[in-house]
Swiss-Prot record:
InterPro entries in alphabetical order: Cyclotide (IPR005535), Cyclotide_bracelet_CS (IPR012323), Cyclotide_sf (IPR036146)
BP terms from Gene Ontology: defense response; killing of cells of another organism
Organism: Viola odorata (Sweet violet)
Functional note: Probably participates in a plant defense mechanism. Has hemolytic activity.
Recorded domain comment: The presence of a 'disulfide through disulfide knot' structurally defines this protein as a knottin.
Signal peptide: 1-22
Descriptive protein name: Cycloviolacin-O13
Length: 115
């Protein structure tokens, strides 16, 4: 009987806990940042190039909705780093460097005075 309970507990952990823990290991990026990078890097490119870029981003970073990120930035930012670019740089450098962002305190920011 105890072996059955342990097996059920193991299956539940493997089903629900492990996938959510895996998402914390990845950096994130917003759909708006992806669009800004695509417009800046290849404005006249074909759709295939855009799909390749988006696939590469999805494999390296987790796409997350903008309101969630904005709320987290407002709570944790003191406003001195610049404007958040909608991307983290904990493990992977800022892909949004193409639009003038740089990594500060594990978040990609754009300094409006540098532009």
């Amino acid at each position: 009987m105890d072996a059955k309970k342990m097996f059920v507990a193991l299956v539940l952990i493997a089903t629900f806990a492990l996938p959510s823990l895996a998402t914390f290991e990845k950096d994130f990026i917003t759909p708006e940042t992806i669009q800004a990078i695509l417009k800046k890097s290849a404005p006249l490119s074909n759709i295939m190039l855009e799909e390749d870029v988006i696939n590469a981003l999805l494999k390296s970073k987790t796409v997350i909705s903008n309101p969630i990120i904005e709320e987290a930035f407002l709570k944790n930012s003191n406003g001195l780093n610049g404007i958040p670019c909608g991307e983290s740089c904990v493990w992977i450098p800022c892909i949004s460097a193409a639009i003038g962002c740089s990594c500060k305190s594990k978040v990609c920011y754009r300094n409006s005075l540098d532009n």
